[in-house]
Amino acid sequence: MGLKMSESAKPYFAMVCLQFGYAGMNLVTKVVLDRGMSHYVLVAYRNAFATAAIAPFALLSERKVRPKMTFPIFMQIFVLALLGPLIDQNLYYAGLKLTSPTFAGAVTNIVPALTFIISIICRMEKVEMRKVRFQAKVVGTLVIVVGAMLMILFKIPLITFLRSHLTGHALSPAGEDYLKATVFLLIASFSWASFFVLQAATLKRYSSHLSLSTMVCFMGTLQSTALTFVMEPNLSAWNIGFDMNLLASAYAGIMSSSIAYYVQGMMTKQKSVIFVTAFNPLVVIIGSIIGFLILNQTLNLGGVLGMAILVVGVCTVLWGKEGDIDEEENIEEKFVEIVKCCNRCDIKVLSMMPRIDEEVDVEMQSAGTAKVAVGFS
């Protein structure tokens, strides 16, 4: 029983660890972006590091089981690279540069909701409004969106709010225009959600997720490099040394691209795309706590309320999705039992039936008896 529980906890542990990696990536890349590094160059280097890190494992471990590459699968990989490395990463970094890791993470908390909607449109998620589990997924998704909106709209320092509430002084919140960054982050979120859904569909036709992750990173490297040459014609923008720029590129590529794509693909095959995206809100929670404890960042009232609501939403979605997974596993177990039962019945029937050589012997004996009877007559 203990072994079974530990096996069932591995997907949750893997996804939580992955969110810590994303939170660290946000903090590190924010530093290099503020220092002037081009986000186009950062994306190109990130995917180059990701390809170099994951390609050897794909070549060695999946060389005998890799499915045949077809043109439709190649086009899906091309679109995956377009949605993930090119559009999502560039627009996310553009929004991150204009705002903060907390704000960027709060806006992208709508990814679970977008993924849920796209999955329903693509008929990857069943609409069963009468079932409590489906209702839980809907309610949990809405709760996540509400928590994200709180973290975005209420940028009021908690200490200032408490002080003003006690003293009766009016608040004067700073008017900061985040419209441009919000547009970038919303488009990036839609692209990221579409990436998850297309990745799940591609894995059904191309099951080697390690090789798939490698090809997505490699295709993303080619696409982002071409875009960088167009957007950054000055070749000096590519200059990189043994500094923070190199660390950010390597960390983002290895942790947030190669490992992330692999783990997300594996969890998508084992669980579902809704399960994978449900953990995304943890990034902003982890980032806010790290920023408050280590970087002395201000803890916002909206952040505190939003984080509490996000946790409730994530748990609700996971509870609803886990019920679907249990039902699917029960159906599979029943199907296997039926197949085994049918096989046993077939074996029993076949064992009762005479073999071909026995049938031939019976026919020969019958023919011989008939000839003897004719002779006597």
UniProtKB/Swiss-Prot annotation:
Task: Kindly indicate whether the keyword Endoplasmic reticulum belongs to this entry.
Answer: no
Chief localisation class:
membrane
Q: Which UniProt keywords apply?
A: Membrane, Repeat, Transmembrane, Transmembrane helix
Q: Where are the transmembrane segments?
A: 13-33, 40-60, 67-87, 102-122, 142-162, 183-203, 210-230, 235-255, 274-294, 299-319
Molecular function in Gene Ontology: transmembrane transporter activity
Q: Which InterPro entries match?
A: EamA_dom, WAT1-related
- Keyword Signal present in the record's keywords: the answer is no
The protein in question is named WAT1-related protein At3g56620
Q: Could you tell me which species this protein originates from? A: Arabidopsis thaliana (Mouse-ear cress)
